[in-house]
Amino acid sequence: MAALEELKKKLSPLFDAEKGFSSSSSLDPNDSYLLSDGGTVNLLSRSYGVYNFNELGLQKCTSSHVDESESSETTYQCASHEMRVFGAIGSGASSVVQRAIHIPNHRILALKKINIFEREKRQQLLTEIRTLCEAPCHEGLVDFHGAFYSPDSGQISIALEYMNGGSLADILKVTKKIPEPVLSSLFHKLLQGLSYLHGVRHLVHRDIKPANLLINLKGEPKITDFGISAGLENSMAMCATFVGTVTYMSPERIRNDSYSYPADIWSLGLALFECGTGEFPYIANEGPVNLMLQILDDPSPTPPKQEFSPEFCSFIDACLQKDPDARPTADQLLSHPFITKHEKERVDLATFVQSIFDPTQRLKDLADMLTIHYYSLFDGFDDLWHHAKSLYTETSVFSFSGKHNTGSTEIFSALSDIRNTLTGDLPSEKLVHVVEKLHCKPCGSGGVIIRAVGSFIVGNQFLICGDGVQAEGLPSFKDLGFDVASRRVGRFQEQFVVESGDLIGKYFLAKQELYITNLD
């Protein structure tokens, strides 16, 4: 009991009797926001400057004064109306993450949505935006594509690289544990990202855990979720706030002592322990106080030496030193025998990740999203239709009515003629697609062949039958309650050969065949 009382005394500035542990001490006391009549949100922070969000994107300013337009530094054009948003792929305490297709470049992204009216979430948003803006395109961190504000929902959406292999936490749910050679390759690349955060950006992440370590189907692991990271002026500076996931928190942070980069090394060691053994080394289901007492009082956990290599055990032991000064840096860990031992084996991380999850469901989800994207463009507003041209390359082929068109310009012209014919001169004459059947099969490396079969009806919006991926703003076919046969004015069959691009989530149409029958 004495230990418990001592812990509570140490944490008293951070403990709220009604709400439990609070992270309020991490907030910028000068954080505020302004909402203009024009639908622009100005997030202001003495620490970070001004970030202006509206439906057209994000503008980052160097000055802390909103009216100093000449201080504008960077603009990210990522508009809300250019996003085709699908269902949620995850959620956390402060945000929801959804898949989306960015219409201008036809790339699948992850949209992280955050409510701006809660101060703590607003501070986390500022921190994450700042980190992502100042660490562009580093191979160990998820890519940032922009952000925008939606007045109707009061949310700011951050557009991020879509990591289609999920997180290490997702992988553990399927495999229970990850082999050492795979972990060596994974953590080699993750350490490079962490080294960049610490050594170049001078940031303590403060929430390293399997759920925040992502990987794509190309086998590229990356660190995400920078909402509670903290900046330090130099390598000797220290933090003094209590935020992050208690489960992976270092002893010095639990004691409410000042801390620095070694806190992330402890969390990384626990994450590796869990990934390698398949078990979290502490009892985590008896409440946060009990867990923190274990971390403070129990000896640091070590893997069973009879089951794991000496190099793996040594790496874990080095990370989980109670004394933060005794832990190695991320740079030093890159030279650890556990990392260097497997360098010559060239573990194929892409093959490993692709073997984990059901490829059938992944393929079906991809086919659903790309089908919705294409027909929503075709049957949608004219101001977005021109983006369809970039779905094709100069070697793409489109076939219709015995004619073959090659290249993006020819194909777009042919499709525009068909689209104009189906649209008619009056709204009452517009024909739209209803996809009644959708078939798909894999094609090449990451591609898919899609065959859509359906009807034309008079209407103003594309529809798709079935229980697959749903898109925001697209009505459910079941809820409409009408019989397609009674409104059918023609049928169509269309086949698409979709190939993946160089970037994750980027696709183009290599071949397309269209057949229209019984059109009155």
Curated annotation (Swiss-Prot):
List the keywords (alphabetical).
Abscisic acid signaling pathway, ATP-binding, Cytoplasm, Kinase, Nucleotide-binding, Nucleus, Phosphoprotein, Plant defense, Serine/threonine-protein kinase, Transferase
Q: How is it modified after translation?
A: Phosphorylation at Ser-235 and Thr-241 by MAP kinase kinase kinases positively regulates kinase activity. Phosphorylated by MAPKKK20.
One family name in Pfam for this protein: Pkinase
Q: Where in the cell is it found?
A: Nucleus; Cytoplasm
GO MF assignments? ATP binding; MAP kinase activity; MAP kinase kinase activity; protein kinase activity; protein serine kinase activity; protein tyrosine kinase activity
Lineage, top-rank taxon, reads Eukaryota
Which of this chain's residues are annotated to bind ATP? I89, G90, S91, G92, A93, S94, S95, V96, V97, K112
Recorded catalytic activity of this chain's protein: L-seryl-[protein] + ATP = O-phospho-L-seryl-[protein] + ADP + H(+); L-threonyl-[protein] + ATP = O-phospho-L-threonyl-[protein] + ADP + H(+); L-tyrosyl-[protein] + ATP = O-phospho-L-tyrosyl-[protein] + ADP + H(+)
Instruction: Tell me what the record says results from S235E.
Output: Constitutively active
* Modification sites for Phosphoserine: S69, S235
Which segment of the chain is annotated as a signal peptide?
Answer: none
Does Nucleus count among this protein's keywords? yes
The modified positions for Phosphothreonine read: T241, T245
Q: In which tissues is it expressed?
A: Mostly expressed in leaves, and, to a lower extent, in roots, seedlings, flower buds, flowers and siliques.
What residues make up the catalytic site? D207 (proton acceptor)
Annotated consequence of substituting T241D: Constitutively active
The record's section on InterPro entries has: Kinase-like_dom_sf, NTF2-like_dom_sf, Nuclear_transport_factor_2_euk, Prot_kinase_dom, Protein_kinase_ATP_BS, Ser/Thr_kinase_AS
| Annotated Protein kinase domain residues | 83-339
One of this protein's GO BP terms? defense response to other organism
The record ties this protein, via PANTHER family, to: DUAL SPECIFICITY MITOGEN-ACTIVATED PROTEIN KINASE KINASE 5, DUAL SPECIFICITY MITOGEN-ACTIVATED PROTEIN KINASE KINASE 5-RELATED
How is the subunit organization of this protein annotated in UniProt? Interacts with MPK1, MPK2 and MPK7. Interacts with P.syringae type III effector HopF2. Interacts with MPK14. Binds to MAPKKK17 and MAPKKK18. Binds to MAPKKK20.
Family according to the record: Belongs to the protein kinase superfamily. STE Ser/Thr protein kinase family. MAP kinase kinase subfamily.
Name this polypeptide is given: Mitogen-activated protein kinase kinase 3
